[in-house]
Swiss-Prot record:
It comes from the Bacteria. This is Nod factor export ATP-binding protein I. CDD domains: ABC_DR_subfamily_A (cd03230). NCBIfam families: nodI, PRK13537.1. The lineage of its organism: Bacteria, Pseudomonadati, Pseudomonadota, Betaproteobacteria, Burkholderiales.
Length: 304
């Protein structure tokens, strides 16, 4: 049986008295996109740092590309491309030079590094920016350049930490399209995100993390079906607790978050009829999504 590119087994990490990763286990299979989904502070970035050997676990075992981590992390990283949460491009270099210099870090000859530049610029849709300084690029261009740089060594595995944070919707969608093209080429991707839409669009499977613990795992559609399994009506108005007392008979389940009442309904029509014509209330009827899964599992909405 082939060795999984990424394997976490009962991993723990403490910083002082705080347990930030708590018995975390997951396996990423070759060619899939696996997501770590959770709010800021859930332990996602610490998990990636341990995977790459940059932070040592206090318990458990980790393997990356078949190599034990941290003891063989340096060797494993030769087969990995990394897109960090914050761009660390060299501002003194042009777009082209950022790629060339990174190629030399992997021991490439100048000729080999130069041969990579054109296809990587085309992949990142930056052909017209080859000689521009990093400071001249938009946020989306910088993220695509960081992704292109992560591909210099033709990695088997890509590790991306919040790859579209801070991007506008158009730039985010272009980044997703580029990542899907990499999956089509057989790359294995591990991604952390707190964007529900990103997780639903990209991930074959995902792990929902809260306070360093895995609280759910599976394909996005399977999690939505198993945890919710029906439509949702969001009701916005004053005093959601009183609203819940009035409307709970029309729903399978209800949740309150802030000023919003979430009603999970198999048949939405009786509740919609009840709400029709009510002044001071607004409501939205929609299919269930991963935000509902997170709310159901944790009792709160995802926070940035």
């Amino acid at each position: 049986m082939p060795v999984a590119p990424i394997d976490f087994r009962n991993v723990e990490k403490r910083f002082g008295d705080k347990l930030v990763v708590n018995g975390l286990s997951f396996t990423v299979q070759a060619g899939e996109c696996y997501g770590l989904l959770g709010p800021n502070g859930a332990g996602k970035t610490t998990t990636l740092k341990m995977l790459l050997g940059l932070t040592h676990p206090d318990a458990g075992t980790i393997s990356l590309c078949g190599e034990p981590v941290p003891s063989r992390a340096r060797h494993a990283r030769q087969r990995v491309g990394v897109v960090p949460q914050f761009d660390n491009l060299d501002p003194d270099f042009t777009v082209r030079e950022n790629l060339l210099v990174f190629g030399r870090y992997f021991g490439m000859s100048a000729q080999a590094a130069h041969a990579l530049v054109k296809p990587l610029l085309e992949f990142a849709k930056l052909e017209n920016k080859a000689d521009a300084k990093v400071g001249e690029l938009s946020g989306g261009m910088k993220r695509r350049l960081t992704l292109a740089r992560a591909l210099v060594n033709d990695p088997d595995v890509l590790v991306l930490d919040e790859p579209t944070t801070g991007l506008d919707p158009q730039a985010r969608h272009l980044m997703w399209e580029r990542l899907r093209s990499l999956l089509a080429r057989g790359k294995t991707i591990l991604i952390t995100t707190h964007f529900m839409e990103e997780a639903e669009r990209l991930c074959d499977r995902l792990c929902v993390i809260e306070e360093g613990r895995k609280i759910a795992e599976g394909a996005p559609h399977a999690l939505i079906e198993s945890e919710i399994g029906c439509d949702v009506i969001e009701i916005y108005g004053p005093d959601p607790a009183t609203l819940r007392d009035e409307l709970s008979a029309f729903a399978k389940h209800t949740e309150i978050s802030g000023e919003t009442l979430f009603c999970y309904v198999s048949d939405p029509e009786p509740l919609r009829a009840r709400l029709k014509g009510r002044t001071g209330l607004r409501y939205l009827h929609r299919p269930a999504n991963l935000e509902d899964v997170f709310l159901r599992l944790t009792g709160r909405e995802m926070q940035d």
